[in-house]
C-alpha cells in the first residue's frame, strides 16, 4: 500500500568511524497482458498514467509523506515542467533511527512501486528522490550491488530506461566518498547528488544546521532544474518491462 499517491497538473513556470555508525547518523508479461485486456482498457490505463511520476523517500523521523525537502523539490519540479502532469508516491517505510532495519524496508517498497509503474505506464518518466535516510533508500535500489549493505533486491536493469532522473539530498554515502553519481553504473549519469555545505551527514563538516537547510539554500530548485532538463531530453518511450518480473 502506498503512503501517499497523488497526481497534479503542474502550473506554467513563472521563471526560468564504521559504515554502521555513519548510517546511524542519518505474473504475466506486459505485452501479453495488453493483448488480453483489449485496446479500450489499455487506452484507459494510458490516460490514467501521469507524464511524470516522482517517487520520494523522506528523511529520518519525518512524518509520513514526501517530507519537507521532498515536497519543496516536487513543487519546484512542477513549476519547471510547463504543464506536464506529475504523480507523487511517498515511499512507505518507517524512516526510523533503526537505520539498518528501516532503510531496506523503504528500498523494497520503492523498488516494487517503480517496477509497477514501469510495467503499467511505460511512457511515464519516473523520477527517484530522497533526503537523508531517504537518499540512502535510493542508493540501495540503484547502486552497484556491492554498495548496498546487504540489500538484495536491486531493480532489474531494464527499469533504468524508465527512470529519467534521480535527485538525492544529504546522502550519507557521500561522506565515505561514494556518491550515487559514482557508484551506480546505470543511474549515475542521470543523478544529481547534493550536499549542503558542511552538512555532517554527507561531508566531513560539522555544520549540523546545514542538514536542515536544503530548501532555504535553493538546492531543491537546483535539483528540479536538473531533473526537468533530463525529462526534456528523455526519449518518448522506453522498452516494455515484463510485469511478471516485477517485485511486489
What are these regions (language model features)?
Residues 47-125, 197-246:
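Active-site catalytic motif of lipid deacylating hydrolases and related acyltransferases
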Residues 81, 145-149:
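Active-site catalytic pocket residues across diverse enzymes, especially alpha/beta-hydrolases
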Residues 128-134, 138:
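Gly/Ala-rich beta-loop-alpha elbow adjacent to hydrolase catalytic centers
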Residues 151-170:
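A conserved short beta-strand
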Residues 167-174, 196-198:
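Active-site nucleophile loop of the alpha/beta-hydrolase fold
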Residues 181-200:
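Surface-exposed loop and adjacent secondary-structure segments within mature catalytic domains
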